[in-house]
Amino acid sequence: LDLGCGEGRHTLSAALTAPIHAVGLDMSRRDLTTARNRCGDFESLTKTENAPSLIEGDGARLPFADATFDRIICSEVLEHIHDYETFLREIRRVIKPGGLFAASVPSFFPEWVCWKLSDAYHEVEGGHVRIFNARALERSISNFGFERFESHRAHTLHSPYWWLRCLFWRGEQAQHPIVNLYHRLLVWDLMKKPWLTRWIDRLLNPILGKSVVFYFSTDP
Protein backbone atom coordinates (compact mmCIF):
# COMPACT_ATOMS: atom_id res chain seq x y z
CA LEU A 1 0.00 0.00 0.00
CA ASP A 2 1.24 3.45 -0.98
CA LEU A 3 -0.78 5.68 1.35
CA GLY A 4 -1.11 9.18 -0.06
CA CYS A 5 0.22 8.02 -3.41
CA GLY A 6 -0.37 11.31 -5.26
CA GLU A 7 0.45 10.88 -8.95
CA GLY A 8 1.70 7.35 -8.37
CA ARG A 9 5.48 7.66 -8.39
CA HIS A 10 6.11 5.03 -5.73
CA THR A 11 3.10 2.88 -6.61
CA LEU A 12 4.13 2.50 -10.23
CA SER A 13 7.78 2.01 -9.32
CA ALA A 14 6.87 -0.84 -6.96
CA ALA A 15 4.64 -2.47 -9.58
CA LEU A 16 7.43 -2.26 -12.16
CA THR A 17 10.14 -3.54 -9.84
CA ALA A 18 8.63 -6.68 -8.33
CA PRO A 19 5.87 -9.23 -8.99
CA ILE A 20 3.49 -7.73 -6.46
CA HIS A 21 0.01 -6.25 -6.27
CA ALA A 22 0.60 -2.55 -5.62
CA VAL A 23 -2.21 -0.41 -4.25
CA GLY A 24 -2.14 3.38 -4.25
CA LEU A 25 -4.65 5.39 -2.22
CA ASP A 26 -5.13 9.15 -2.31
CA MET A 27 -7.86 11.73 -1.71
CA SER A 28 -7.09 13.64 -4.91
CA ARG A 29 -9.10 12.41 -7.88
CA ARG A 30 -6.98 14.54 -10.20
CA ASP A 31 -3.72 12.99 -8.99
CA LEU A 32 -5.17 9.50 -9.32
CA THR A 33 -6.21 10.24 -12.90
CA THR A 34 -2.64 11.30 -13.63
CA ALA A 35 -1.37 8.08 -12.04
CA ARG A 36 -3.70 5.95 -14.18
CA ASN A 37 -2.59 7.77 -17.31
CA ARG A 38 1.04 7.14 -16.39
CA CYS A 39 0.37 3.41 -16.23
CA GLY A 40 -0.25 3.60 -19.96
CA ASP A 41 3.38 4.63 -20.47
CA PHE A 42 4.52 1.16 -19.37
CA GLU A 43 3.44 -1.85 -21.39
CA SER A 44 3.70 -4.24 -18.45
CA LEU A 45 1.31 -2.11 -16.37
CA THR A 46 -1.39 -2.24 -19.04
CA LYS A 47 -1.83 -5.96 -18.33
CA THR A 48 -4.55 -6.67 -15.80
CA GLU A 49 -2.42 -8.96 -13.64
CA ASN A 50 0.33 -6.33 -13.27
CA ALA A 51 -1.71 -3.13 -13.09
CA PRO A 52 -1.68 -1.38 -9.71
CA SER A 53 -4.97 -0.59 -8.00
CA LEU A 54 -5.48 3.16 -7.65
CA ILE A 55 -8.18 4.03 -5.14
CA GLU A 56 -9.73 7.30 -4.01
CA GLY A 57 -10.02 7.26 -0.24
CA ASP A 58 -9.24 8.74 3.16
CA GLY A 59 -6.21 7.55 5.11
CA ALA A 60 -8.11 8.11 8.34
CA ARG A 61 -10.68 5.49 7.28
CA LEU A 62 -8.90 2.98 5.09
CA PRO A 63 -11.29 0.81 3.03
CA PHE A 64 -9.39 -2.40 3.75
CA ALA A 65 -9.77 -5.31 6.14
CA ASP A 66 -7.43 -5.80 9.07
CA ALA A 67 -4.02 -7.30 8.24
CA THR A 68 -4.30 -6.79 4.46
CA PHE A 69 -0.83 -5.54 3.44
CA ASP A 70 2.68 -6.96 3.66
CA ARG A 71 4.32 -3.58 3.03
CA ILE A 72 3.10 -0.01 3.50
CA ILE A 73 4.78 3.26 2.56
CA CYS A 74 3.66 6.76 3.48
CA SER A 75 5.98 9.22 1.76
CA GLU A 76 5.80 12.97 2.45
CA VAL A 77 2.19 12.75 3.64
CA LEU A 78 2.02 12.97 7.44
CA GLU A 79 3.20 16.60 7.49
CA HIS A 80 -0.04 17.52 5.67
CA ILE A 81 -2.33 15.85 8.22
CA HIS A 82 -3.61 17.54 11.39
CA ASP A 83 -4.55 14.29 13.14
CA TYR A 84 -1.70 12.20 11.78
CA GLU A 85 -1.95 9.65 14.59
CA THR A 86 -5.29 8.51 13.16
CA PHE A 87 -3.38 7.64 9.98
CA LEU A 88 -0.82 5.72 12.01
CA ARG A 89 -3.56 3.80 13.82
CA GLU A 90 -5.11 2.81 10.49
CA ILE A 91 -1.73 1.80 9.08
CA ARG A 92 -1.19 -0.46 12.08
CA ARG A 93 -4.63 -1.98 11.59
CA VAL A 94 -4.22 -2.93 7.92
CA ILE A 95 -0.61 -4.14 8.01
CA LYS A 96 0.00 -7.86 8.43
CA PRO A 97 1.88 -9.30 11.40
CA GLY A 98 5.55 -9.19 10.46
CA GLY A 99 4.87 -6.49 7.87
CA LEU A 100 7.18 -3.58 7.08
CA PHE A 101 6.30 0.11 7.12
CA ALA A 102 8.34 2.97 5.63
CA ALA A 103 7.54 6.63 6.31
CA SER A 104 9.23 9.83 5.21
CA VAL A 105 8.63 13.45 6.21
CA PRO A 106 10.55 16.69 5.62
CA SER A 107 13.62 17.02 7.85
CA PHE A 108 13.41 19.63 10.58
CA PHE A 109 16.12 22.12 9.53
CA PRO A 110 15.42 22.35 5.77
CA GLU A 111 11.69 22.62 6.51
CA TRP A 112 12.25 25.28 9.18
CA VAL A 113 14.18 27.38 6.64
CA CYS A 114 11.27 27.07 4.18
CA TRP A 115 8.81 28.30 6.80
CA LYS A 116 11.05 31.25 7.65
CA LEU A 117 11.47 32.25 4.01
CA SER A 118 7.79 32.11 3.06
CA ASP A 119 4.54 32.03 5.00
CA ALA A 120 2.73 31.12 1.79
CA TYR A 121 4.74 27.89 1.56
CA HIS A 122 2.85 26.35 4.46
CA GLU A 123 -0.37 28.38 4.28
CA VAL A 124 -1.49 27.15 0.86
CA GLU A 125 -4.48 24.82 0.79
CA GLY A 126 -3.31 21.29 1.50
CA GLY A 127 0.12 22.53 2.60
CA HIS A 128 2.29 21.46 5.49
CA VAL A 129 0.67 21.91 8.90
CA ARG A 130 3.69 21.09 11.09
CA ILE A 131 7.44 20.66 11.21
CA PHE A 132 8.24 17.23 12.60
CA ASN A 133 10.92 16.49 15.13
CA ALA A 134 12.34 13.18 13.92
CA ARG A 135 12.69 11.60 17.36
CA ALA A 136 9.19 12.65 18.38
CA LEU A 137 7.72 11.16 15.21
CA GLU A 138 9.64 7.95 15.72
CA ARG A 139 8.19 7.69 19.24
CA SER A 140 4.68 8.33 17.92
CA ILE A 141 4.99 5.55 15.36
CA SER A 142 6.60 3.18 17.87
CA ASN A 143 3.66 3.74 20.23
CA PHE A 144 1.47 1.91 17.73
CA GLY A 145 3.53 -1.26 17.96
CA PHE A 146 6.18 -0.60 15.32
CA GLU A 147 9.91 -1.09 15.87
CA ARG A 148 12.37 1.04 13.91
CA PHE A 149 15.25 -0.87 12.36
CA GLU A 150 16.70 1.82 10.07
CA SER A 151 16.53 5.52 9.30
CA HIS A 152 18.41 7.98 7.12
CA ARG A 153 18.25 11.42 5.53
CA ALA A 154 17.83 11.89 1.77
CA HIS A 155 17.64 14.41 -1.09
CA THR A 156 20.21 17.04 -0.13
CA LEU A 157 19.98 18.66 -3.56
CA HIS A 158 16.26 19.23 -3.08
CA SER A 159 16.72 21.50 -0.06
CA PRO A 160 18.22 24.47 -1.97
CA TYR A 161 15.52 24.06 -4.62
CA TRP A 162 12.76 24.53 -2.08
CA TRP A 163 14.60 27.38 -0.39
CA LEU A 164 14.73 29.13 -3.76
CA ARG A 165 11.04 28.37 -4.35
CA CYS A 166 10.22 29.96 -1.01
CA LEU A 167 12.52 32.94 -1.53
CA PHE A 168 10.93 33.69 -4.92
CA TRP A 169 7.48 32.35 -4.04
CA ARG A 170 5.03 32.24 -6.92
CA GLY A 171 2.85 29.35 -5.86
CA GLU A 172 1.88 27.15 -8.80
CA GLN A 173 2.45 29.93 -11.32
CA ALA A 174 5.47 30.17 -13.62
CA GLN A 175 8.57 30.06 -11.46
CA HIS A 176 11.45 32.52 -11.22
CA PRO A 177 14.20 31.81 -13.81
CA ILE A 178 16.65 30.86 -11.04
CA VAL A 179 14.17 28.27 -9.74
CA ASN A 180 13.65 26.89 -13.24
CA LEU A 181 17.39 26.61 -13.76
CA TYR A 182 17.84 24.69 -10.52
CA HIS A 183 14.94 22.43 -11.44
CA ARG A 184 16.72 21.56 -14.68
CA LEU A 185 19.72 20.55 -12.58
CA LEU A 186 17.54 18.23 -10.49
CA VAL A 187 16.05 16.60 -13.59
CA TRP A 188 19.52 16.15 -15.08
CA ASP A 189 20.74 14.62 -11.84
CA LEU A 190 17.76 12.25 -11.70
CA MET A 191 18.29 11.04 -15.25
CA LYS A 192 22.09 10.91 -15.40
CA LYS A 193 23.02 10.11 -11.79
CA PRO A 194 26.56 11.53 -12.09
CA TRP A 195 29.09 10.44 -9.49
CA LEU A 196 29.73 14.00 -8.29
CA THR A 197 26.17 14.76 -7.23
CA ARG A 198 25.82 11.25 -5.76
CA TRP A 199 28.92 11.96 -3.67
CA ILE A 200 27.63 15.39 -2.60
CA ASP A 201 24.29 13.83 -1.67
CA ARG A 202 25.90 11.17 0.53
CA LEU A 203 28.24 13.70 2.14
CA LEU A 204 25.62 16.30 3.02
CA ASN A 205 22.51 14.19 3.60
CA PRO A 206 23.09 13.95 7.37
CA ILE A 207 22.94 17.77 7.54
CA LEU A 208 20.90 19.03 4.59
CA GLY A 209 18.85 16.02 3.51
CA LYS A 210 15.38 17.34 2.66
CA SER A 211 13.65 14.22 3.97
CA VAL A 212 14.08 11.85 6.88
CA VAL A 213 13.08 8.26 6.16
CA PHE A 214 12.15 5.63 8.75
CA TYR A 215 11.80 1.86 8.32
CA PHE A 216 9.72 -0.09 10.83
CA SER A 217 8.82 -3.72 11.40
CA THR A 218 5.94 -5.32 13.26
CA ASP A 219 5.91 -8.45 15.39
CA PRO A 220 5.16 -11.68 13.47
What residue ranges belong to the model's regions?
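Conserved SAM-binding loop
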Residues: L1-C114, A136, F214-S217
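Short, hinge-like loop/turn segments at secondary-structure boundaries
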Residues: G40-F42, D119-H122, C166-R170
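Short, solvent-exposed loop/helix junctions and linker helices
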Residues: I81, I131, P206-I207
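Short, glycine-/aromatic-enriched active-site segment of Class I SAM-dependent methyltransferases
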Residues: P106-R130, E138-S140
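A C-terminal cap/extension of S-adenosyl-L-methionine-dependent methyltransferases
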Residues: K116, H158-P220
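Short glycine- and hydrophobic/aromatic-rich loop-to-beta-strand nucleating segment
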Residues: R130-I131, F214
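Conserved S-adenosyl-L-methionine
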Residues: F146-T156
